[in-house]
Amino acid sequence: MSEKTVTETNTDRGFRKTREGLVVSDKMDKTVVVAVEDRVKHALYGKVIRRTNKLKAHDEQNSAGVGDRVLIMETRPLSASKRWRIVEILEKAK
């Protein structure tokens, strides 16, 4: 029975997307812009193309700086364009 209650509490929160990216701007208060790279294969020619999305992520402690590699997770809308938050800083900029 205890195992069943544990699985139920895990499913309450639901699945959230995570992405890894590079911080390209930290000029806003408690917000960073993260560039997330995605590699896709061209449908007709087969060449691998790099596509980059820039996402605004919430940084509560203002700890991330430009050049840091971070892990971000999807969250509820925090502003008009901010729907991600920083989970951890994987690598600090050199």
From Swiss-Prot:
GO MF annotation list: rRNA binding; structural constituent of ribosome
Q: What CDD domains does the annotation carry?
A: Ribosomal_uS17 (cd00364)
The UniProt entry's GO CC annotations, sorted and at most eight, read: cytosolic small ribosomal subunit
The record ties this protein, via PROSITE patterns, to: RIBOSOMAL_S17
Instruction: Name the job this protein performs.
Output: One of the primary rRNA binding proteins, it binds specifically to the 5'-end of 16S ribosomal RNA.
Listed under subunit, the entry gives: Part of the 30S ribosomal subunit.
Q: Which HAMAP family match?
A: Ribosomal_uS17_B (MF_01345_B)
Q: What is this protein called?
A: Small ribosomal subunit protein uS17
Q: Which organism is it from?
A: Streptomyces griseus subsp. griseus (strain JCM 4626 / CBS 651.72 / NBRC 13350 / KCC S-0626 / ISP 5235)
What is this protein's gene name? rpsQ
